[in-house]
Structures are given as structure tokens and as C-alpha cells.
């Protein structure tokens, strides 16, 4: 969320700190609260970052998705796309962080697609339409296709970061 050096610094700080806290053994809620507090305290200027966290459990064939101000994600299963969307503020805005959590059962061949708000722009309906019609051989091809479509929609007016991540369940 945001552009330029400041947004890059806030994003890197959030990602690195969150990952380190999770690796040290903190649960997601506690780590999110700590990162949010750090974001609030680190600057007198507005400092914020969106979070889109994905935790896979291969034993139970589930994924947990946590979102904090992030753009929608999508599950592509058997040619049908489901949308994972959550209403929550980015980290660094409110005193209390409220990460939306979803748990999804996944099967072999399912593709999980997550994008930044620079990809969705003002709406994400076009992504659902693309997922219904585009037949990707692999997740990399799908991610590249969505990125190309987003660039075409922006008509050269790139205003935000444009990130697409696609993962396939094997």
C-alpha cells in the first residue's frame, strides 16, 4: 500500500519483523499486535503496511489465510474461482490490529493466487473473469498472465507496486 521509498521501507520492516516474530515462536495474533505497535511508534508520520499471510498445513490439507488491509486473494479449483476478501485496516493505523482469518481445505491442483492492491486497482472482478477463462499450465504462467492483464488495464500508468503470487497444491 503506497508508493515510493517510504512505502518500501514500511513494507520491508513489517515483513521482516513479522517473519522474525513468527519464527521465534509467537502466534500470529501476538506477532501482529507487536508489529502494529512498532509501526505506530516508529514514526510521527503515518506509517502503514498491508499484510497477506498464508500458512500451509500439508498434514491436514488446509491453508490459513490472514489479511490485514490486503487486496483479495483467490482459490482456483477445477476451473472455478473463489474470492477471499476481508475488511480490515492496514497495520500501523489503529491501536488494535484486527487480522481477518480464513481456513480453507485444499486439494491437489488447487491454485492459491494473491495480489497486491496495485494489481486490483479499483476493482478485482476482472481477475475472477480471467481465472474462469485462462487455462494455466502452471502457477508461474498464471501469475505472469494476471500481471500482463493488470499492466494492460493500467495503460502504462503504474501508480503502485504490482505483485502477483500463485502457488499450486501438489
Regions found by a protein language model. Give the residues of each.
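Active-site-proximal, acidic helix/loop segment immediately C-terminal to a metal-coordinating Asp/Glu
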Residues: 2-25, 85, 95, 106, ...
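Catalytic core of PPM/PP2C metal-dependent serine/threonine phosphatase domains
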Residues: 5-78, 85, 151-160, 167
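Short gly/ser/thr-rich secondary-structure transition/capping motifs
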Residues: 46-48, 92-98, 147
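Tryptophan-centered short beta-strand motifs
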Residues: 63, 81, 99-101
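Active-site donor-binding loop signature of nucleotide-sugar glycosyltransferases
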Residues: 86-87, 93, 169
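Conserved, helical-rich catalytic subdomain that frames metal- and/or nucleotide-binding sites
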Residues: 88-90, 98-100, 105-106
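Conserved active-site loop/cleft motifs that coordinate metal ions or position small ligands
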Residues: 113-115, 163-167
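Terminal helices and disordered tails flanking the catalytic cores of nucleotide-processing hydrolases
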Residues: 146-148, 166-170
Amino acid at each position: 500500500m503506497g508508493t515510493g521509498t517510504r512505502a518500501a521501507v514500511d513494507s520491508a520492516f513489517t515483513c521482516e519483523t513479522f517473519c522474525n516474530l513468527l519464527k521465534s515462536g509467537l502466534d500470529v495474533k501476538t506477532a501482529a499486535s507487536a508489529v502494529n505497535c512498532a509501526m505506530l511508534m516508529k514514526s510521527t508520520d503515518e506509517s502503514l503496511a498491508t499484510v497477506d499471510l498464508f500458512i500451509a498445513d500439508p498434514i491436514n490439507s488446509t491453508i490459513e489465510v490472514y489479511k490485514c488491509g490486503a487486496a483479495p486473494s483467490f482459490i482456483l479449483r477445477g476451473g472455478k474461482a473463489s474470492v477471499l476478501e476481508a475488511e480490515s485496516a492496514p497495520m500501523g493505523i489503529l491501536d488494535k490490529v484486527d487480522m481477518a482469518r480464513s481456513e480453507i481445505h485444499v486439494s491437489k491442483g488447487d491454485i492459491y493466487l494473491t495480489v497486491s492492491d496495485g494489481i486490483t486497482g479499483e476493482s478485482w472482478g476482472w481477475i475472477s473473469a480471467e481465472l474462469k477463462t485462462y487455462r494455466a499450465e502452471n502457477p508461474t504462467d498464471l501469475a505472469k498472465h494476471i500481471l500482463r492483464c493488470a499492466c494492460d488495464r493500467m495503460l502504462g500508468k503504474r501508480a503502485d507496486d504490482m505483485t502477483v503470487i500463485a502457488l499450486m497444491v501438489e
